[in-house]
Amino acid sequence: MTAEDASVPGDDRRDQMLRAAAEIIAERGFSETRIADVARRAGASPALVIYYFGTKDHLLTEALRFSEQSFYAAADQMLSGLANVRGRLEGLVRLTCMPQQTDEIPGSWGLWFDLWSQAFRHPAVARDRVELDQRWRNMITRVVDDAVAAAEIDKIDSTEFAVTFAALLDGLSIQVSLQDPVVDADRAYRIAMRFASQALGFAWAPTRRRRAAKAGGPA
């Protein structure tokens, strides 16, 4: 450990390394990221990065967890301020499909691409992938269960809905992240909300405000 390594509290130093790893993996991809690159950007030694994370695979999963913190913090705050299922699901879809809705790492969807690729071949990464995906499904399930309890919607298999809706949002978000010329953020938003409203039985239609904003009118 260098003198510079020792000058920063452990938790802060770990966060610095995770942010550096998340940024570099998002920029270059997992295969092109080296421990030395992460150490250099974080102002740490490669030995310290290895001390904290052991392997590059583990660094990837921890970097993704770090980048997801801002997403879930924003989601929890958003959900607490909305009173109905339609507004809550609209908020979750915007956080998922609209670019940079939170203070997340730029290009953070690239971390998920690399995680999925590594999970296909590495059991330890696969286990982490299951945990991360389940956290997302659990949030959707909670939104639906709360709506059922409040008599906003009829009783439904919330777990089944969450699995389907999460998979739909994953697919749409991939297209948006890849800048697909057919599936942009607005279309992804409309598709997701149309599905949710039909599956859960609440009224929904794109607002005039959104159409005006897309056409270049006032927001």
Language-model features, listed with the residues they occupy:
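Helix-turn-helix
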Residues: 16, 20-58, 62
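Short coil/turn segments at alpha/beta junctions that flank glycine-rich nucleotide-binding fingerprints
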Residues: 27-31, 81-82, 150
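Hydrophobic/aromatic-rich alpha-helical bundle segments in the mid-to-C-terminal region
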Residues: 126-130, 148-214, 219
